């Protein structure tokens, strides 16, 4: 059967389509298709009338490829969404260069012919994984927005009570509390602290901390009072400065509520997955990080082996050899998902902060011990964490695969027992 590759260069509201056969001959010159039901139905009918095996190839360009991919997939057409970087490297073989939508659609169609046997069919994601991916994208956008506002708040602290930020920790998604935000809302200027004696401030601070649900400590109060006493503020303690702070606090409070809402929903969705407890039981992983792990990784079963999962995180280090030269100091590729890599690194940071005697570490010590061993070998802390993350992902992949294999065996055994019971019932009748 003739192989027919359909290259789709996706844009926001329209796509350019080129249809090419296995010999590289253009069957239909590049044409424009708008992302409407009528035009996509026309495209699907056109592709079905072609005499051959049709595969539609498009680049992964954020979210714009999904409407057309979903519509054509529901029509029974093979869809493959490929990494845009792969197509870019493939296009670099063209010495002439140049870039237009028509030229790009030809390049994508040509890529489909060249890598026909390696094309992976895109599957419509299940509801849980889809929801987690959507929530994770929203979480990352809100997190970026929060970082901008947090920098604004830290700038305010540097001008109103310099040095105080060392004693103020930010939002904790486990407790859903933000000590820095609550503190500056109560003690908005250095003068608010030093106008009291240390004993008076300690009493006020401990009462406030207890009311807010923090651990009130006289030692913490003494440190804060000492910083306030010695610092030199640039901002005066006047109504204008207080109004500016209140605006920052309101913005940051809103983003914090958004983040807490998103993470709470992510945890609820992630708990529906059979493999959730496997990740949750690993040391360094709480409910928020476990939910974000699946939000950024998706369905682990789609990877053919653990190496593919490691490569998706972009922490694989390919060989570097030429002639007699063989590199011993290789860097990670960083070609995978940055969000997944960042989430994994956060897990390793949380794991490193734990102790060997803690229950979760004692039950699953492999990754923790491996990280310590790498540090003992003289590896920099970041390198040791990335190496440990590599091991962490391999362990997770093996355990999830084993879980689903056992579930499949149990399902087959159940079906077999059911069929035997039916057969016995018929025989008795």
Where are these regions (language model features)?
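A detector of single, family-specific signature residues
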Residues: 1-429
């Amino acid at each position: 059967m003739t192989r027919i590759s359909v290259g789709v260069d996706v844009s926001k509201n329209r796509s350019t389509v080129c249809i090419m056969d296995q010999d590289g001959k253009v069957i239909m010159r590049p044409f424009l298709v708008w992302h409407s039901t009528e035009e996509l139905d026309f495209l699907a009918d056109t592709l079905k009338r072609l005499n051959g095996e049709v595969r539609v190839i498009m680049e992964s360009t954020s979210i714009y490829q999904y409407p057309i991919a979903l519509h054509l997939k529901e029509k029974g057409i093979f869809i493959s969404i490929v990494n845009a970087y792969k197509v870019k490297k493939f296009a670099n073989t063209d010495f002439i260069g140049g870039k237009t939508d028509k030229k790009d659609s030809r390049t994508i169609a040509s890529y489909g012919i060249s890598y026909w046997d390696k094309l992976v069919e895109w599957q419509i994601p299940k509801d849980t994984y889809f929801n987690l991916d959507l929530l994770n994208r929203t979480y990352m956008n809100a997190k970026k927005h929060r970082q901008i506002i947090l920098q604004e708040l830290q700038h305010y602290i540097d001008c109103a009570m310099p040095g105080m930020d060392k004693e103020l920790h930010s939002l904790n998604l486990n407790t859903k509390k933000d000590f820095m935000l609550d503190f500056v809302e109560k003690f908005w200027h250095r003068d608010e602290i030093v106008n009291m004696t240390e004993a008076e401030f300690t009493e006020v601070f401990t009462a406030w901390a207890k009311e807010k649900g923090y651990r009130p400590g006289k030692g913490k109060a003494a440190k804060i009072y000492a910083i306030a006493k010695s610092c030199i503020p640039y901002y005066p303690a006047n109504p204008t400065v207080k109004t500016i702070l209140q605006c920052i606090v309101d913005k940051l409070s809103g983003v914090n509520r958004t983040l807490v809402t998103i993470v709470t929903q992510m945890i609820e969705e992630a708990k529906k997955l059979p493999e959730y407890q496997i990740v949750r039981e690993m040391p360094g992983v709480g409910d928020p990080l476990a939910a974000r792990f699946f939000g950024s990784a998706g369905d682990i079963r789609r990877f053919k082996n653990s190496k593919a999962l490691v490569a998706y995180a972009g922490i694989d280090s390919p060989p570097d050899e030429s002639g007699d030269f063989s590199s011993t100091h290789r860097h990670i590729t960083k070609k995978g998902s940055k969000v997944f890599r960042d989430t994994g690194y956060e897990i390793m940071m949380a794991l490193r902060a734990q102790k060997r005697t803690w229950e979760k570490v004692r039950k699953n010590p492999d990754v923790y011990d491996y990280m310590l061993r790498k540090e003992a070998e003289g590896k920099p802390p970041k390198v040791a964490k990335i190496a440990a993350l590599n091991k962490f992902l391999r362990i997770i992949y093996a355990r999830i695969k084993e879980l689903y294999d056992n579930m499949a065996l149990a399902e087959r055994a159940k079906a077999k027992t059911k069929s035997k019971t039916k057969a016995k019932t018929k025989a008795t009748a």
